[in-house]
């Protein structure tokens, strides 16, 4: 059996780029909660002792940007300079302007257009992906890297590993074989964890705790063997982290946000963007489409692409590739997808309920992935029934 190795990485909620994603989406949540028609393009950057929020926002909501920044930093665990940032003492800069009227008239006609006539907020192409290798219909390498990162945060916050600090990165290499286009995991080849820690813990303690409390509960035993390689804090020291260690910026972890390098990516980031931005809403609808194709048994693996022009409601193109795993031709699956899913931005917003803020809805997406999550707020993860005739064996 010929196999190959594929690697996916993830980062924790305390990584500087992810901190910025979460702040941008916390701002979006606050705007949508008060004004569902808010137009939000919110960016965040951070470095030592400083967070800046900037961008274009048009909303009727009253937003305390500084409070959102400090609350988000605090909830992640940035409560002192020792851990990389002090939520209560850091400098917060705000530079928010209104959305360009040129963009506004082209996209939503200053709220005069019907939902089905609302144009895309920009040009671009987005991809959705699904694979039957996990219950989430997501790539195993990505799922494991993401869940290990989430587990690091869990054992830090519940006190299991008191030496942990907020920043951290994970990476998992999986050995696969290609079953006529479908990806079948064989084993976990390598696990890499680099996590921020305090001054008191030894490298031996770090390795022991990570294996026992992080890796063991997450990676199924069937994927581990005596050949699995573990790199646990291989640099030897990771005390300085968060914004003190590295600058952070919204939208720099787009592969971590999606499929861990599998499928494809059109390049557009998600966080801080309202649903008229098809970078986000378009990526959500094609994930639902790809997932529905696989969940309905039409294929074991699927990639769906959609593309847009600014101000134009109808997509320019829709594409489906099942990597040779489809039970019916891809062109027939494409026809079913186009009949089932409405790719117009205004209709995607309604069908996926993307104007609803609150409950930290979009902030939740900004750490540990936008896809493959079992959460009712992730409406794009709901499988739609597809009408098709399964070929007779």
From Swiss-Prot:
Matching PROSITE patterns: ADOMET_SYNTHASE_1 (PS00376), ADOMET_SYNTHASE_2 (PS00377)
The tissues in which it is expressed are: Highly expressed in stems and roots. Detected in trichomes (at the protein level).
Residues reported to bind Mg(2+)? 9
What Enzyme Commission number(s) appear in the record?
2.5.1.6
Q: Which GO terms describe its biological process?
A: one-carbon metabolic process; S-adenosylmethionine biosynthetic process
Which terms are listed as keywords in the entry? ATP-binding, Cobalt, Cytoplasm, Magnesium, Metal-binding, Nucleotide-binding, One-carbon metabolism, Potassium, Transferase
Localization recorded for this chain is: Cytoplasm
Q: What is this protein called?
A: S-adenosylmethionine synthase 2
Name its species: Arabidopsis thaliana
